[in-house]
């Protein structure tokens, strides 16, 4: 009789444990799914027109994903060159900032870089052999701070515009297409950074 009761008790405990595990599994699944969907929503932040806000949402999402590949790099990783013609992760982040800075003056002021801006951004914009010599021995934070500063300016400038401005043509492209290009440019280099950082 005692043995039967013990068996029944153990089976009941086992069943209860299984039920708890199932509950935990579904709870974790729900939380993970909710997190993934919340991260994947394109939604205009407060203060922006609809189309510009959607672009900001995508730009910022991509920027976070770019930075995920590099934020923990040490100095060796920041300056790492995949081969003699490659660009380092630090240089690529600088390049992303320079490209975005260029499209700021192009879309908001209708011009190219002036002499002072060229001195600041041209090497990072074009990269190449001289950039490989110059862009080293600085921590990844140095480059990420530059990127942050440029993005903050982009967002402040875009907040002053509306979707009618976004549709306007400037040169051979609309303002919308220009900022789409900035976004796809980030995506291109995100893949490059993913490859490079796996080789470090």
Model-found features: residue ranges?
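Basic/aromatic DNA-contact patch characteristic of tyrosine site-specific recombinases
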Residues: 71
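Hydrophobic alpha-helical segments, especially transmembrane helices
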Residues: 20-24, 64, 101, 152
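Glycine-rich, acidic and aromatic/proline-enriched surface loops and short helix-turn segments
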Residues: 98, 152-163
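Bacterial Sec-dependent N-terminal signal peptides
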Residues: 1-43
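Short, helix-capping/interhelical loops that line the mouth of catalytic, cofactor-
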Residues: 38-54, 102-151, 164, 200
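Short, contiguous alpha-helical
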Residues: 56-60, 67, 78-126, 164-200
């Amino acid at each position: 009789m005692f043995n039967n009761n013990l068996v029944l008790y153990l089976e009941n405990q086992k069943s209860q444990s299984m039920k708890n595990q199932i509950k935990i599994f579904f709870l974790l699944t729900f939380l993970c799914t909710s997190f993934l969907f919340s991260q994947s929503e394109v939604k205009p932040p407060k203060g922006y027109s609809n189309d510009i806000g959607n672009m900001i949402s995508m730009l910022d999402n991509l920027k976070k994903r770019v930075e995920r590949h590099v934020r923990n790099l040490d100095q060796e990783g920041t300056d790492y060159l995949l081969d003699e013609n490659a660009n380092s992760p630090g240089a690529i982040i600088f390049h992303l900032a320079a490209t975005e800075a260029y499209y700021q003056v192009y879309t908001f002021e209708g011009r190219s870089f002036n002499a002072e801006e060229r001195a600041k951004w041209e090497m990072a914009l074009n990269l190449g052999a001289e950039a490989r010599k110059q862009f080293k021995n600085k921590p990844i934070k140095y480059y990420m701070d530059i990127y942050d500063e440029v993005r903050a300016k982009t967002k402040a400038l875009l907040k002053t515009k509306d979707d009618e401005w976004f549709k306007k043509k400037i040169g051979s492209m609309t303002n919308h297409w220009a900022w789409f290009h900035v976004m796809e440019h980030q995506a291109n280099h995100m893949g490059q950074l993913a490859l490079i950082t796996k080789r470090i």
